[in-house]
């Protein structure tokens, strides 16, 4: 069965006569992760997403699968241990998506510096031990000031004392979501985008037994019934819970906005991802990451109460990031006009004073005494003179000394929670993209327990080894496997660059992609084939779905976007049979998204439509 708009109507009709085991609200990474595991276990599963899959938070991250070294700023050892373990699992189950990309960490001797050269080496050694890369080619190492500047000549030299290099992974966040979605759909789940939940249904005993849905394409409403309903809507979690009049649990979300800006690689040349203090003594850090022929940087971390579906980049966001990056790279002199693209996303944070921070924050700093106690414990642990509980005890004692004052946006917990209301609504919230599988595993175990109470019995899969769509590759030899797939594409007539692009984008699905080889007017064969496959197998419903989330044209391929978008619109018009009015509406939406991304309004101009 294909996965396209042509199957969507039939799927919706099927929901009217089906009682599902599990109904998932939300088609970001959390909901997709739950759906993979429930469908694989044989649970009758339906997922409803009000926008495109991954359109909310899950396509707007920093696009890294973090190992979490930032958590060692407060020596949150347990968080780092969990994070690097999950990162390794994600690399196993989706080997064509996360790619190793060692991170440079320049160290400056200035007020509020996160690390000194000594403390960063201790942190990186502990990080490597937890990530199980000690002794490998990805083992961390220190650089002198001169070595750092030899790598990145544009970096600020003043107060630079050296740097460290440690293992991190780049990620294609939206592709990770769609590959999970496709796996669940292949295993029998009904996956429906542009389907907004507008009401919660209850049985005669007041227990949740379904939802009312509004089709965003037709405005028609329908009901879907299920034994278990789980809310996985990220920042929207409290909003969905408000639809349930019987939900007595207090609100738990405190979304913060993160902004990233994209410039041409020639404007900001960095050979590898770089992570540094802002230099503002505000406890925050900023990433600068090369991608395609571009460089992006971020992020901000500010409380957000606006339109969750359309967070925007403000002048204040731009000024903050440009000030920091231009000070760290003084010869770059990036201006607003240099920004080619941008994105703003919401983090689904749970308000919790005890949480580990993400991007720094002025509160909760360890005292020098506490810091030194932890360092000594870690040194002994790395020398195999102490056991891990000794380190954990030192960390716990230090954390207990940290004053629980007003919570800074950057200190709200990235931890997750799973709660069940009195009438049965499950809500899985919080977490990080790296943790999505682990979060889903905990939720699915609870779902299975609830279904067992009603007499159902399911055997859960081992989700640590269950591959996403496209991920059926040997993770230990992924580059060799992708090279072999690229050879197949070359045999099919694609040049080397196009073949490599398709292999890395689609992984083990490439042979199926090649079955969709075609040539649309205005597009080359590579783009035509990718679009044709996405229309049939990836539930692409609009040009924005394809150009922003199934591919990265809008963010990182601006040089060719104008040439590509007309051909994409024309091909989709033929595929869907759009009228001139429908085509014009899609073109308008596409141009609005592009204008928002390239900050046309802030630049004071208008794009031609």
From Swiss-Prot:
Keyword Cytoplasm appears in the UniProt entry: yes
Gene Ontology molecular functions: glycerol-3-phosphate dehydrogenase (quinone) activity; glycerol-3-phosphate oxidase activity
GO cellular component, one term: cytoplasm
Subcellular location: Cytoplasm
Organism annotation: Enterococcus casseliflavus (Enterococcus flavescens)
Record InterPro entries: DAO_C (IPR031656), DAO_C_sf (IPR038299), FAD-dep_OxRdtase (IPR006076), FAD/NAD-bd_sf (IPR036188), G3P_DH_FAD-dep (IPR000447)
Enzyme Commission code(s) on record: 1.1.3.21
Lineage: Bacteria, Bacillati, Bacillota, Bacilli, Lactobacillales
Keyword annotations from UniProtKB, A to Z: Cytoplasm, FAD, Flavoprotein, Glycerol metabolism, Oxidoreductase
Domain of life: Bacteria
A Pfam family that the UniProt record links to this protein: DAO
Flavoprotein in keyword set: yes
Names of the cofactor(s): FAD
Protein name: Alpha-glycerophosphate oxidase
Pathway listed: Membrane lipid metabolism; glycerophospholipid metabolism
Enzymatic reactions: sn-glycerol 3-phosphate + O2 = dihydroxyacetone phosphate + H2O2
Family membership: Belongs to the FAD-dependent glycerol-3-phosphate dehydrogenase family.
GO BP term, example: glycerol metabolic process
Residues reported in the UniProt entry to bind FAD: 21-49
């Amino acid at each position: 069965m294909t996965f396209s708009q042509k199957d969507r109507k039939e799927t919706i009709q099927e929901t009217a006569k089906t009682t599902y085991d599990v109904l998932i609200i939300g088609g970001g990474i959390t909901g997709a992760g739950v759906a993979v595991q429930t469908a694989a276990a044989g649970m009758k599963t339906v997922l409803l997403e009000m926008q495109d899959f991954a359109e909310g938070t899950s396509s707007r991250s920093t696009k890294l699968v973090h190992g979490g070294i930032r958590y060692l700023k407060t020596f949150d050892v347990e968080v780092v241990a969990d994070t690097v373990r999950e990162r390794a699992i994600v690399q196993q189950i989706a080997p064509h998506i996360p790619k190793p990309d060692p991170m440079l960490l320049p160290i400056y001797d200035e007020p509020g510096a996160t690390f000194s050269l000594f403390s960063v080496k201790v942190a990186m050694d502990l990080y490597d031990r937890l990530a199980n890369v000690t002794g490998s080619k990805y083992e961390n190492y220190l650089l002198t000031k001169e070595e750092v500047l030899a790598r990145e000549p544009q970096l600020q030299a003043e107060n630079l004392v050296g740097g460290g290099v440690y293992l991190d992974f780049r990620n294609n966040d939206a592709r990770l979501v769609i590959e999970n979605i496709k796996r669940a759909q292949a295993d029998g789940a009904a996956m429906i985008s542009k389907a907004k939940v507008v009401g919660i249904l209850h049985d005669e005993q007041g227990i949740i037994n379904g939802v009312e849905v509004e089709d965003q394409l037709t405005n028609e409403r329908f009901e879907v019934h299920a034994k278990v309903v789980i809310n996985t809507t990220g920042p929207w979690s409290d909003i969905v819970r408000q639809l349930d009049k019987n939900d007595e649990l207090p609100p738990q979300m405190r979304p913060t906005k993160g902004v990233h800006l994209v410039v041409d690689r020639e404007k900001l040349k960095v050979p590898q991802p770089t992570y540094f203090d802002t230099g503002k003594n505000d406890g925050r850090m900023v990433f600068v990451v090369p991608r395609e022929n571009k460089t992006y940087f971020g992020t901000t971390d500010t409380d957000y109460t606006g339109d969750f579906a359309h967070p925007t980049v403000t002048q204040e966001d731009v000024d903050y990031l440009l000030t920091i990056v231009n000070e760290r790279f003084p010869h770059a002199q990036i201006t607003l006009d240099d920004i080619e693209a941008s994105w703003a996303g919401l983090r689904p944070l749970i308000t919790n004073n005890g949480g580990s921070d993400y991007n720094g924050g002025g509160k909760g700093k360890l005292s020098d005494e506490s810091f030194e106690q932890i360092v000594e414990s870690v040194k002994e642990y790395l020398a195999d003179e102490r056991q891990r509980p000794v380190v954990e005890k030192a960390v716990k004692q230090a954390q207990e000394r940290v004053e629980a004052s007003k919570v800074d946006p950057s200190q709200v917990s990235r931890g997750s929670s799973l709660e069940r209301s009195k009438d049965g609504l499950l809500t899985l919230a919080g977490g990080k993209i790296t943790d999505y599988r682990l979060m889903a595993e905990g939720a699915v175990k609870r779902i299975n327990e609830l279904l067992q109470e009603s007499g159902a019995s399911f055997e859960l899969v081992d989700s640590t080894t269950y591959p996403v769509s496209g991920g059926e590759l040997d993770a230990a030899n992924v580059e060799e496997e992708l090279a072999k797939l690229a050879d197949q594409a070359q045999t099919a007539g694609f040049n080397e660059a196009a073949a490599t692009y398709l292999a890395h984008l689609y992984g083990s699905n490439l042979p199926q992609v090649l079955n969709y080889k075609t040539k649309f007017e205005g597009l080359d064969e590579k783009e035509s084939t990718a679009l044709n496959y996405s229309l049939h197998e990836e539930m692409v419903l609009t040009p924005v779905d394809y150009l922003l989330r199934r591919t990265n044209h809008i963010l990182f391929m601006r040089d060719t976007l104008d040439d590509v978008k007309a051909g994409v619109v024309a091909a989709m018009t033929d595929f869907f049979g759009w009228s001139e009015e429908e085509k014009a509406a899609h073109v308008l939406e596409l141009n609005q998204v592009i204008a928002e991304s390239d900050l046309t309004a802030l630049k004071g101009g208008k794009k031609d439509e």
